[in-house]
């Protein structure tokens, strides 16, 4: 576990994209001159149809997709050589497929979230310092998992429980920013609300910026501080949930309910 990272300046947004583009082989434009800022403590939701660029956007922010132009900064640190590693240390990820190691215990999966701050031999032998174990147990308690569940293998948990573990693991590295890529895509509406409430609470209680992609418009309205709607690799709406209805009426995009596929 690392010390809480600090912004280089209190005035800076946690996440900043400036005129950022991503072009794939063959000239396919995945993102085009994308501008976005997310502040500390803000829960921002990305909406858009399949192929609009939501996943590409999150992969670009995390450094997995290179920028063709423009910049991505996390806490004032550029997600580009030579500072990419430092920028990634300020980032936590919550994946659609949980991203857990099934054969490891729930507790071990959470402690793996601080892998970047521990010697490699400790990770290989799973010999974690006592403060790391205590912090992981505290996070599991915060996301609603018991001590008995902490000692079970990850594969024994339900989908909702596994996603709780994913959130705890993302918080383990004391990030400035959490990226959540369709974190409730395979969950029922009730469990989806529990998971999104945990992410929102992380933003508010810890001052973390959270950027979350969803396809359920009603859940975005319920939980988001701000909604960004994407179309063809560009943002076409960037405002508070209260303004979304007017945008939908003007653009004739039908809302998708949380129970829909």
Curated annotation (Swiss-Prot):
<keyword id="KW-0997">Cell inner membrane</keyword>
<dbReference type="InterPro" id="IPR003439">
    <property type="entry name" value="ABC_transporter-like_ATP-bd"/>
</dbReference>
<feature type="binding site">
    <location>
        <begin position="48"/>
        <end position="55"/>
    </location>
    <ligand>
        <name>ATP</name>
    </ligand>
</feature>
<comment type="function">
    <text>Part of the ABC transporter complex PhnCDE involved in phosphonates import. Responsible for energy coupling to the transport system.</text>
</comment>
<dbReference type="InterPro" id="IPR050086">
    <property type="entry name" value="MetN_ABC_transporter-like"/>
</dbReference>
<dbReference type="GO" id="GO:0005886">
    <property type="term" value="C:plasma membrane"/>
</dbReference>
<keyword id="KW-0547">Nucleotide-binding</keyword>
<dbReference type="InterPro" id="IPR003593">
    <property type="entry name" value="AAA+_ATPase"/>
</dbReference>
<comment type="subunit">
    <text>The complex is composed of two ATP-binding proteins (PhnC), two transmembrane proteins (PhnE) and a solute-binding protein (PhnD).</text>
</comment>
<dbReference type="Pfam" id="PF00005">
    <property type="entry name" value="ABC_tran"/>
</dbReference>
<keyword id="KW-0472">Membrane</keyword>
<dbReference type="GO" id="GO:0016887">
    <property type="term" value="F:ATP hydrolysis activity"/>
</dbReference>
<dbReference type="InterPro" id="IPR012693">
    <property type="entry name" value="ABC_transpr_PhnC"/>
</dbReference>
<dbReference type="GO" id="GO:0005524">
    <property type="term" value="F:ATP binding"/>
</dbReference>
<keyword id="KW-1003">Cell membrane</keyword>
<feature type="domain" description="ABC transporter">
    <location>
        <begin position="15"/>
        <end position="257"/>
    </location>
</feature>
<keyword id="KW-1278">Translocase</keyword>
<keyword id="KW-0067">ATP-binding</keyword>
<dbReference type="InterPro" id="IPR027417">
    <property type="entry name" value="P-loop_NTPase"/>
</dbReference>
<dbReference type="GO" id="GO:0015416">
    <property type="term" value="F:ABC-type phosphonate transporter activity"/>
</dbReference>
<comment type="similarity">
    <text>Belongs to the ABC transporter superfamily. Phosphonates importer (TC 3.A.1.9.1) family.</text>
</comment>
<protein>
    <recommendedName>
        <fullName>Phosphonates import ATP-binding protein PhnC</fullName>
        <ecNumber>7.3.2.2</ecNumber>
    </recommendedName>
</protein>
<keyword id="KW-0918">Phosphonate transport</keyword>
<keyword id="KW-0813">Transport</keyword>
<dbReference type="InterPro" id="IPR017871">
    <property type="entry name" value="ABC_transporter-like_CS"/>
</dbReference>
């Amino acid at each position: 576990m690392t010390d809480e990272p600090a912004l280089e300046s209190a005035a800076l947004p946690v996440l900043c994209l400036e005129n950022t583009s991503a072009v794939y082989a063959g000239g396919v434009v995945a993102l085009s001159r994308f501008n976005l800022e997310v502040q500390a403590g803000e829960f921002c939701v990305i909406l858009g149809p399949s192929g609009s660029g939501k996943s590409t956007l999150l992969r670009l922010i995390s450094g997995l997709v290179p920028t063709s132009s423009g910049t991505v900064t996390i806490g004032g640190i550029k997600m580009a050589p030579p500072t990419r590693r430092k920028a990634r240390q300020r980032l936590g990820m919550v994946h659609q497929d949980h991203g857990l190691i099934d054969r490891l215990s729930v507790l071990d999966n959470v402690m793996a979230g601080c892998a970047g701050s521990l010697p490699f031999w400790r990770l290989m032998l799973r010999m974690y310092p006592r403060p790391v174990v205590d912090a992981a147990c505290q996070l599991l308690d915060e996301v609603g998992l018991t001590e008995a569940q902490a000692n079970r293998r990850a594969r024994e948990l339900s989908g909702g429980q596994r996603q709780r573990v994913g959130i705890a693991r993302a918080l383990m590295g004391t990030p400035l920013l959490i990226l959540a890529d369709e974190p409730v895509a395979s969950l029922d509406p009730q469990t989806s609300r529990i998971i999104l409430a945990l992410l929102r609470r992380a933003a508010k209680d810890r001052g973390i910026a959270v950027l979350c992609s969803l396809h359920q418009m009603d859940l975005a309205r319920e939980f988001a501080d701000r909604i960004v709607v994407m179309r063809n690799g560009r943002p076409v709406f960037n405002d508070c949930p209260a303004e979304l209805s007017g945008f939908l009426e003007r653009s004739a995009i039908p809302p998708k309910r949380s129970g829909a596929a």
